[in-house]
Amino acid sequence: MRENIKTGIKYLALFGMCFLGGRSLAAGQTVRVDGEKPCRLAILIDDFGYCGAGTEEMLALSIPFTAAVMPFSSCTTEDAERVRQAGKEIFIHMPMESLTGKREWVGEKGVFRDMDDAAIRERVKEAFSVLPDAAGMNNHMGSAIMEDARSLSAVMEVLKEKGVPFVDSMTTAKSLGKAVAAEKGVALLERDVFLDSTDSVEVVKEHLRKAGEVTLIAIGHVGPEGGKITAQAIKEVAPELERAGITFVTVSELAK
């Protein structure tokens, strides 16, 4: 769930991130698209952990992608095992406090500003204990945390220990993600642009084609924000993009 959901509109978010000439992403470095020739495309699918609509269809996709799993939800264990059985990469979709959303939307085990540093670190470590094979993390909601250097530093300290990257969903224009990640030595991938969509498969397909024009991390969802529609669009457009010379990779491959 994102914080800026417009009523009746589903979103496909695209993150600008180009892997240039085999150069690795250094800790704290954010590489943006500069009109380079398309090379690799990573798809990150949010909101696993709810047994949401489209989960089966998404996991049946033949291309590699990264599944962002809610760590403390009713269907976390079941969805995570299904992701593993499908051979897909797991990220932790970490629930974090929002500036505008209700606390209960985040859940009891989210990261909140009224927690001290030790409690935040323990909460993030608990998420990794639930999903020990997670190759990285991105924020679920989280505008309040992404603007709070102290809270965010505690999160990044655990990611540094684990040696995994963080994807900043940019739920706030005032995000301190890049600065704090650089300070803590954590590789950061930063959202570049949001694109909205309707329930039309064709519209989502056009968004994916747009992603193929520049190398991006494309973010979609299982559940009501995407689900079967997004899965169908990816299935139909992926061969077209591959014929155009684009290679699908996981998110962690872009951060190596």
Label each residue range with its predicted role.
Residues 5, 10-43, 48-57, 249:
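N-terminal pre-catalytic segment of deacetylase/amide-hydrolase enzymes
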Residues 34-104:
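Active-site beta->alpha N-cap acidic-glycine motif
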Residues 41-45, 65-67, 90-94, 137-139, ...:
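Hydrophobic faces of well-ordered beta-strands that scaffold small-molecule active sites
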Residues 48, 66-72, 138-148, 163-174, ...:
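Catalytic beta/alpha-barrel core
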Residues 105-106, 110-129, 146-150, 179-212:
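Alpha-helical scaffold elements lining the catalytic groove of polysaccharide deacetylases
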Residues 117-166:
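Hydrophobic, well-structured mid-protein blocks that either form specific transmembrane helices
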Residues 158-202, 249-252:
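His/Asp/Glu-enriched short active-site or ligand-binding loop at hydrolase and phosphoryl-transfer sites
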Residues 159-171, 225-256:
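C-terminal domain-boundary segment and adjacent tail
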